[in-house]
Structure formats: structure tokens, C-alpha cells
């Protein structure tokens, strides 16, 4: 994906009637990585001395995951006050306007019912299963669009990098929560089963109905934001211990050394807001037949299909 495609996408989202969608400070990691990624330089150096282990270590060392939001990239660690100021649009809901939208929303609400029934207020364990599922769509969609680009021998329109960044980000969420809790054997088996089923179902769904697939992920992320908001409420109420944040989370989100689990929840929720907005926008692009992200879309072209509401997300 070309570097130029992403600023255009960010600007196109800002020009829509959705001011909460992808603010100028929440660009994908594929864009953020450009100024800091020295891979090209290192590759040239390795090519000159391919057998030097030191050169290979320098090259490999550059490939650390980067966060998807610009708030988490910088030289100054982020404190709790800064995390709380990140606008996530908690409670904002995309109103379904088509059969495809209603189908996606119905599936998500169906899954939410069983998640609530099984996990109740065990939010850390819920997060482990949630992030296992959430890491699948970006990888599946990115893989299918990658293969399509190769087969048709044409540019992908800028989707692949965004989708793979999403998958990587969700994977880091999972690894973080695995550090916080120790899932039981049953939960690990459940994760393996759910991931296997969801991968195959989503793979088929994306091949046949990509618009519905992206809309479904958008609604999944809406539910994720609600869950993480309830998670915060339980921590504030003293029902969930607010222990120290894992070192993995501190490094990934550039948090302060004394960061807590609550800070991690705030950071993860901000990421989920980004994924919500991106996937709803991807679905919109398919609806209006303007899938090339290198080309801007106007607010007028999206106005007929963008309907928003605010839902009550008070903890149960």
C-alpha cells in the first residue's frame, strides 16, 4: 500500500458527517510507522554484508508492533489523564439502514447475548475470548484482498495495510490480557473452538458478502466499547483489582512505568473505537462503490447511509 493513500483516507473520514470517526490523531499504524521504520536502510546494509549476524539482528530488531493511534507514539509516556481525554464516542451506534446492516447487527446481538450469559461480569476473561475473535477479521480480509490484488495484478486500493494493522493490534490486545489473567483449560478450549469456527465462517462471509462482513465487525467493536466501559466501571467500583499493567502493554502503548490495568483498558477501548470507525467506513465505501482509499469521498455521498444514535451503556 502506498504511503500517500492513508492521509487521503484520514481526510475522507474527517469530511464525513461522522465527526467521531477516525480523528486526525488516530491514523493506522501502517501510516505511523513510516518515519520510524528504518527497514529499507537496513535491508540495503544487509545486502552488502549478508553473512554478518550483527546486521541481521539490527534488521530483525526493527520489526516490533506499533500502535494504531498516534496518541501512543512519541517520546513522552502517556499518563492516565491523557488516556481519559481520548475521545472514543462511547455509546455511539450506527443505525442499520439496509437488510445487510440489520443482518450484521442481528448476528452481533445474538453473539452478545451468549457472551453476557457465559461471562457475566468476568471482564478480563471476556476480553480474552473477545480479542481472540477480534483478531480474525482483519487477517482474513487482508489475506483475501492480498490474493485478489495478486491475481488481478492491480493495486488493492489501500485496504491491505489497514486490515493487517487491525489484526496485529487485536493480537496485542489478546497477549496483554493473557498476561493479566490465567485462562482455565476450559476457556482455552473455548478460545480454540470459537476461533476455528469464526475464521471459517468469516472467510466464507467475506468472500460472498464483504460489506456485511465489515459492518458486522463495526458492530462487534461497538459492543467491545460497551464491554470495556463496563470493565472500567467495575474497576472503579473496586470489584476488579486494579493491578500493575503488564510490561508488554507499557511498551506497546507507551504508558508510564506505574501504569495500571485501568490504563490498559482505556488504551484498548481507544483502539476499539478506531476499528469500529474504520470498519463502518469500509462498509460504506463498498456501498457507494468507491473502494479505492486513495480517492477521497464527500460527505454528501455518505449522508444517505450514515445514521447515528446514542445508546445507554450504563453497567448492568
Curated annotation (Swiss-Prot):
UniProt: Fe cation 2 binding residues: 170, 221, 272, 275
Keywords of the record: Electron transport, Iron, Membrane, Metal-binding, Mitochondrion, Mitochondrion inner membrane, Oxidoreductase, Respiratory chain, Transit peptide, Transmembrane, Transmembrane helix, Transport
Major localisation: mitochondrion
Any single GO CC term annotated in Swiss-Prot or TrEMBL for this entry: mitochondrial inner membrane
Keyword DNA-binding found: no
Names of the cofactor(s): Fe cation
InterPro entries: AOX, AOX_sf
Free-text remark on how the cofactor is bound: Binds 2 iron ions per subunit.
Enzymatic reactions: 2 a ubiquinol + O2 = 2 a ubiquinone + 2 H2O
PANTHER family membership: ALTERNATIVE OXIDASE
Transit peptide residues according to the UniProt entry: 1-26
One Gene Ontology term of the molecular function aspect: ubiquinol:oxygen oxidoreductase activity
Family stated for the protein in its record: Belongs to the alternative oxidase family.
Function: Alternative oxidase which function may be to reoxidize reducing equivalents produced by glycolysis such as ubiquinol.
Natural source organism: Batrachochytrium dendrobatidis (strain JAM81 / FGSC 10211)
UniProt-recorded name of the protein: Ubiquinol oxidase, mitochondrial
Positions annotated to bind Fe cation 1: 131, 170, 173, 272
Entry EC no(s): 1.10.3.11
